[in-house]
Amino acid sequence: MDLLTLWNLEREEVLKIIENAEYFKKNRYGHDILKNKSIALIFESPSTRTRMSFDLAVHELGGHSLMMNEGEIHLGKKESIADTARVMSRFVDAIVARVKSHKTLEDLAEYGSVPVINALCDLAHPCQILADLLTMKENGKNFKGLKLAYFGDGNNVSNSLMIAGAILGMDVVIATPRSYEPSGLFVKKALEIIAKYGEGSLTLTDDPEIAAKDADVLYTDVWISMSDKNKNLDEILKIFPKFQINAELLSKAKEDAIVLHCLPANRGLEITDEVIDGKQSKVFDQAENRLHAQKAVLKYIFEH
């Protein structure tokens, strides 16, 4: 089974992955789920947390990881992605790919014969969000009816948060400047999932105070993400500051609200030092939880 986006998962499956991630966090070592299995790790862009967490996850589950960075692999350059997928499937048991285009993942999954995991692309970041869900749960947050507020650029993280929130019955509010909204496709999918379960809601707004009011979780990411290199920096610095998570914005949320950021953070831009280093910040727990969530994802794909 592939994991390209979260919308292919049912609620029970997401909850099971989180449950397994909790187990792996409490029982880090002594597993052989990936014994005699080799996992290819493809990285088209630099990575700290994703690379470390997947590499360690494979090893700590008893498997072998094969790291391939951009420039070390023919991925649509000098060889079609289809042929690369076919060849890699003869050598490895699964492919974990952090790529620039979602289409690359779709091609790897279509033409390869082994599971493909989206470790990040321009449209989605499902593994990150599974770690986020673990962080919410271990901080006593019940998913159903939880108000999750996202601030900043409508990027791959916001796309996947909408889907996760819809699956689990959250009330998700995405606060972005106009013309920086999340993907229309992901909005449509989220609304379909909300209708399917009859729970939760999705609101898009350009007013960060509306989003922050009585929120249980406040979430932000960098203002210029991997898909936004052509966006005007002067424009970003002019229209985004009101979406910064700072003490004033945080004060509008619930007293026990937590703050998340998938990192790396541009301190002083999308989030202040005071907040990211404050008692309500769970950012570094969130980063650690990438490891435990990746293990749960690997376990899941080899069981389905």
From Swiss-Prot:
Family statement: Belongs to the aspartate/ornithine carbamoyltransferase superfamily. OTCase family.
Quote the catalytic activity from the record. carbamoyl phosphate + L-ornithine = L-citrulline + phosphate + H(+)
Q: Which GO terms describe its cellular component?
A: cytoplasm
Q: What class of enzyme is it?
A: transferase
The record's annotation in PANTHER family points to: ORNITHINE CARBAMOYLTRANSFERASE, MITOCHONDRIAL, ORNITHINE TRANSCARBAMYLASE, MITOCHONDRIAL
Pathway note: Amino-acid biosynthesis; L-arginine biosynthesis; L-arginine from L-ornithine and carbamoyl phosphate: step 1/3
* Function (record text): Reversibly catalyzes the transfer of the carbamoyl group from carbamoyl phosphate (CP) to the N(epsilon) atom of ornithine (ORN) to produce L-citrulline.
Q: Does the keyword Cytoplasm apply?
A: yes
E.C. no: 2.1.3.3
The family database entries (InterPro entries) matched by this protein are listed as: Asp/Orn_carbamoyltranf_P-bd (IPR006132), Asp/Orn_carbamoylTrfase (IPR006130), Asp/Orn_carbamoylTrfase_sf (IPR036901), Asp_carbamoyltransf_Asp/Orn-bd (IPR006131), Orn/put_carbamltrans (IPR002292), OTCase_ArgI (IPR024904)
- Subcellular localization, as worded in the UniProt entry: Cytoplasm
Q: Keywords for this entry? A: Amino-acid biosynthesis, Arginine biosynthesis, Cytoplasm, Transferase
What this protein is called in its record is Ornithine carbamoyltransferase
Q: Which residues bind L-ornithine?
A: N156, D221, S225, M226
**Species whose genome carries this gene:** Methanococcus maripaludis (strain C7 / ATCC BAA-1331)
Q: Name one GO biological process term.
A: L-arginine biosynthetic process
Query: Gene3D superfamilies, alphabetically?
Result: Aspartate/ornithine carbamoyltransferase
- An example molecular function term from Gene Ontology annotations: ornithine carbamoyltransferase activity
